Amino acid sequence: MLDTNPSSRFTVLLPNEQEEWHRTVRGLLEPQGIQTLSARSGREAIEMIESNAVHVAVLDVQMPQLGGMQVVKRVRELHASEPQRRLPPAILVANDLTSHLLREALMNHVFSVLSKPVDYSLLLDALARVVRRHYESRWPGFQ
């Protein structure tokens, strides 16, 4: 079950196939008290979501092995029999925001879709909106 205990730090899962991007985003988030985890592939992202208290997952549509959309679908399938389990909201990043991708994201309850290269202020805004909508306007881990 997703840990939403106020004593746990707000945790963001980030794709890590582009080390420089990951390092930059981690550098923006960690000084604000946000813990980051990294996944080099879609399969690793699923493992991280299953074994950690992930509050939001940022997933690249073109991650190796399984793309971000496939990760979202697979995690939902794995927990279809557990309606009480709170799955982390997903933010997808993609090179090409096609109408098909946006429609698929909407049908799969993806929180936000951002165009690559990702504007860091848009990513921070999307994370703030996740907090407002899913965590009662408080970063988990902060009183």
Per-segment meaning from a language model:
Residues 1-23, 83, 121-143:
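Non-catalytic signal-transmission and effector/linker regions of two-component phosphorelay proteins
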Residues 19-37, 108:
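Two-component/phosphorelay signaling modules centered on CheY-like receiver
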Residues 41, 67-73:
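Acidic catalytic/metal-coordinating carboxylates
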Residues 44-45:
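Short alpha-helical segment
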Residues 53-55, 80-89:
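His-Asp phosphorelay/catalytic-motif detector in bacterial-type signaling
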Residues 53-58, 63:
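Active-site beta3 strand of CheY-like receiver
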Residues 64-67, 94, 98, 117:
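The feature encodes the CheY-like receiver
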Residues 70, 86, 96-113:
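Alpha4 helix (beta4-alpha4-beta5 surface) of REC/receiver domains from two-component response regulators
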